């Protein structure tokens, strides 16, 4: 019976499992969205949630705790500068797991783990970029029309 047995083994020894989870957590924080297996996504979710909770209290101690888990200094910087402020008023539930179906090669069930709200940030950035391109095209079109009129 599995009473009070928490966590996932992921067919690895302790060091390999910890390394995998640290790498996944770093990737989620840097990219804000990754595709992996459902089990790995469920295993890394508590770690990512804890890192964001640390980022909400921006102290030297919390930065050092996050740096002990995350692999790159850039991910720690992004965590505290961007994500900590973004999720400042939110009490948990910072990640979302979306199932994607089986992987073609081995049939493993795939899932996307993403930070809640990252799709809004990316959508707004894409919208601004498209608007700039449209305005630029309109300006070039006017410039071209003025040249042909002369």
From Swiss-Prot:
Entry GO MF terms: structural constituent of ribosome
Protein keywords: Ribonucleoprotein, Ribosomal protein
Disulfide bonds: none
Gene3D superfamilies (UniProt xref): Ribosomal protein L17
One of the protein's GO biological processes: translation
Glycoprotein in keyword set: no
Listed InterPro entries: Ribosomal_bL17 (IPR000456), Ribosomal_bL17_CS (IPR047859), Ribosomal_bL17_sf (IPR036373)
Gene Ontology CC terms, in alphabetical order: cytosolic large ribosomal subunit
One family name in Pfam for this protein: Ribosomal_L17
Positions of region (Disordered): 126-150
Subunit and interaction comment: Part of the 50S ribosomal subunit. Contacts protein L32.
Similarity comment: Belongs to the bacterial ribosomal protein bL17 family.
Database matches in HAMAP family: Ribosomal_bL17
Name of the protein in question: Large ribosomal subunit protein bL17
Gene: rplQ
């Amino acid at each position: 019976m599995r009473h009070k047995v928490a966590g996932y083994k992921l067919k690895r020894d302790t060091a390999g499992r910890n390394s995998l989870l640290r790498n996944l957590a770093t990737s989620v924080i840097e990219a804000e969205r990754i595709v992996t297996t459902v089990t790995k996504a469920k295993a890394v979710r508590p770690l990512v949630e804890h890192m964001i909770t640390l980022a909400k209290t921006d102290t030297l101690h919390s930065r050092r705790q996050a740096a002990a888990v995350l692999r790159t200094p850039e991910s720690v910087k992004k965590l505290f500068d961007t994500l900590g402020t973004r999720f400042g008023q939110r009490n948990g539930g910072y990640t979302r797991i979306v199932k994607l179906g089986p992987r073609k090669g081995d049939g493993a069930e795939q899932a996307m783990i993403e930070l809640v709200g990252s799709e809004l940030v990316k959508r707004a950035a894409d919208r601004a970029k498209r608007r700039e391109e449209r305005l630029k095209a309109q300006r070039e079109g006017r410039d071209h029309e003025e040249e042909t009129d002369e």
